[in-house]
């Protein structure tokens, strides 16, 4: 008996080629839905201008999805896609419009016109910012991708569906470290920490200053250590990573992926090489609705240092696949919530623990990290066991058991 795949969905998010965490997660979910027969399209408020275009799955990644295409609609006038959700949704004849983004950016004048708006959103602050709560009022259903977010939504009276983010473990997997370092032009005889993330603001949300200060403490004790940054550097609003590294006297021990390559020529396969070149990923963000890099790195067999707040502790097994640094203080922000600033001393102490863990038994660390991700964050399992049942039930709710619309 053929599977029923009548539900049409539009997803407001980054284009799948945009090299962001959102674009990677959407790529991994939506092409699997296309493979399963679901009609989907993307309203790409980031990554596409001009007109609609069909975009194929990247040919150098998972060969299983070669030649599958997804229609991408371009950004219209509103910077975060509120107008596109409405107008592109009508053009695609979408039964439901999803978003994967920070919904505080969305315009309620468009949300109010969308009958079935379903945000799959990050909750990355406590309390939930009021501008997020206001937009949730327009949702037909609410979805979140962390247990932290699910619990906080419940405390605020919102029922939600929790489906965690996941990663493609056929792309992110262990490789030979020496070959990865050779490919990236990195020294072989160092204990290497890596940071991967956006550098959009100052103070930096990804915790760059705290991580650099922690690395200074670590490097003073272990001069054979080094650090690699995959970020973008050049803008007045960004945190001056290189300058701060030089200020602390670490310039000869810190390496950077080329800025242009970081922005435009980095895809999941090249980032997997970076994870495999390192020994430990540093990810002590000030706010985090999930933290995709943390599970990608562990899928490659690398332990991760996070901060003990928001979603981040959910992503590791403390003492086995990573460590959680403590918060130094919370900073009150204009959205009437808090960001958490990690203690550099605590990050350093976690670096010491991770160093000892890797040095003692690197093969066990690699195995433990990878199995944790395969068992809990494998995107194939999540699509099969979470997304397909959710969409099948939504299809019945909206179209009826026989395909006739209930609206």
Model-identified regions with their sequence ranges:
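Carbohydrate-associated surface elements
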Residues: 148, 166
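A short helix/loop element that forms part of the nucleotide-sugar donor recognition site in Leloir-type
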Residues: 173-186
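Conserved donor-binding/catalytic core segment of Leloir-type glycosyltransferases
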Residues: 187-206, 212-215, 228-229
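Nucleotide-activated donor-binding/catalytic signature segment of Leloir-type glycosyltransferases, i.e.
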Residues: 238-273
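Aromatic "clamp/platform" in nucleotide-sugar-dependent glycosyltransferases that forms part
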Residues: 286
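Short hydrophobic beta-strand element within catalytic cores of glycosyltransferases
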Residues: 303-306, 316, 323-324
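A charged, aromatic-enriched C-terminal amphipathic alpha-helix characteristic of glycosyltransferases
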Residues: 341-346, 359-391
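C-terminal alpha-helical cap of glycosyltransferases
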Residues: 353, 379-407
């Amino acid at each position: 008996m053929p599977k029923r795949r009548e539900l049409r969905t539009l997803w407001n998010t980054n284009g799948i080629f945009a090299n962001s965490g959102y674009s990677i997660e959407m790529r991994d979910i939506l092409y699997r839905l296309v493979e399963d027969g679901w009609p989907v399209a993307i309203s790409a408020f980031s990554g596409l201008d001009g007109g609609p275009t069909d975009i194929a799955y990247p040919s150098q990644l998972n060969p299983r999805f070669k030649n599958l295409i997804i229609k991408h609609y371009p950004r219209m006038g509103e910077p975060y896609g509120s107008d596109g959700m409405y107008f592109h949704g009508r053009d695609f004849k979408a039964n439901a419009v999803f978003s994967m983004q920070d919904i505080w950016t969305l315009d309620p004048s468009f949300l109010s016109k969308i009958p079935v708006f379903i945000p799959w959103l990050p909750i990355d602050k406590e309390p939930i910012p009021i501008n997020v709560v206001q937009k949730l009022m327009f949702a037909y259903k609410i979805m979140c991708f962390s247990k932290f977010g699910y619990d906080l939504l419940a405390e605020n009276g919102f029922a939600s569906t929790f489906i965690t983010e996941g990663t493609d473990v056929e792309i992110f997997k262990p490789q030979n470290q020496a070959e990865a370092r050779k490919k990236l032009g990195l020294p072989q005889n160092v204990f290497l920490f890596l940071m991967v993330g956006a550098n959009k603001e100052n103070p930096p949300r990804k915790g760059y200053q705290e991580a650099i200060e922690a690395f200074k403490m670590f490097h003073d004790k272990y001069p054979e250590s080094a650090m690699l940054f995959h970020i973008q550097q050049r803008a007045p609003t960004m945190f001056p990573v290189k300058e701060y590294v030089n200020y602390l006297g670490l310039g000869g021990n810190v390496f950077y992926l080329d800025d242009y390559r970081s922005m435009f020529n980095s895809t999941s396969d090249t980032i997997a090489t970076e994870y495999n070149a390192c020994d430990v990923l540093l990810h002590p963000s000030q706010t985090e609705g999930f933290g995709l890099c943390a599970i990608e790195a562990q899928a490659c067999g690398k332990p991760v240092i996070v901060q003990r707040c928001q979603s981040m502790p959910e992503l590791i097994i403390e003492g086995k696949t990573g460590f959680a640094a403590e918060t130094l203080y919370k900073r009150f922000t204009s959205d009437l919530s808090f960001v958490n600033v990690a203690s550099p001393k605590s990050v350093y102490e976690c670096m010491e623990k991770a160093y000892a863990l890797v040095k003692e038994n690197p093969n066990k660390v690699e195995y433990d990290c990878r199995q944790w991700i395969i068992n809990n964050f494998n995107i194939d399992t999540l699509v099969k066991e979470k997304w397909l049942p959710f969409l099948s039930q939504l299809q019945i709710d909206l179209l009826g058991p026989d395909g006739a619309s209930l609206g």
